[in-house]
Regions:
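An alpha-helical appendage that flanks or caps ligand/catalytic pockets
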Residues: 1-110
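C-terminal helical cap(s) of enzyme catalytic domains, especially alpha/beta-barrels
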Residues: 128-143
Length: 143
């Protein structure tokens, strides 16, 4: 299961459109990394390091009794305006199937060569049909 971040021609991977479309899923991945860190002390992966300290500082502003709920408040459901600043190009690239249609087709081919036989997209509900149709028309048609 993966979130799709399909760039339009000339569009940055962290454009407002892509952040709005993928941000909740991207942040859910960051939430998992933070929860793991809080439980085990595990260091973040390289792609999360640019926002790591700032995110932990932001989370520490909340009372300990509600910190866990705050960490997962927007989990896969909406893009919290307070968290949007933590959605970076690095996080999008690391946690989503991202790129222009031709890049996505090559990534799918590489995954297939590695043994993947199915892919399940996890689009935002308000654009689910458009995302799936765009993937079919612009990526799957190239395979």
């Amino acid at each position: 299961m993966v979130t799709l971040a399909m760039r339009e021609p000339g569009e940055a991977i962290d454009s407002p459109r892509i952040v709005a479309e993928c941000g909740a899923a991207v942040l859910s991945g960051l939430h998992y990394l933070v929860a793991r860190h809080l439980e085990t002390g595990a260091d973040p992966p390289e792609y999360a390091r640019p926002v790591w300290k700032a995110y932990l500082e932001w989370l520490a502003e909340f009372p300990p009794a509600i910190r866990h709920q705050r960490l997962h408040a927007s989990h896969y459901s909406f893009l919290d305006p307070q968290e949007v600043r933590f959605v970076t190009a690095e996080l999008i690239d690391a946690t989503c199937l991202s790129g222009a249609p031709e890049e996505l087709a090559e990534k799918v081919r590489a995954l297939e060569r590695a043994g993947l036989s199915q892919i399940m997209l996890y689009p935002p509900l308000n654009r689910q049909y458009r995302v799936i149709e765009d993937f079919a028309d612009k990526v799957m048609a190239r395979l």
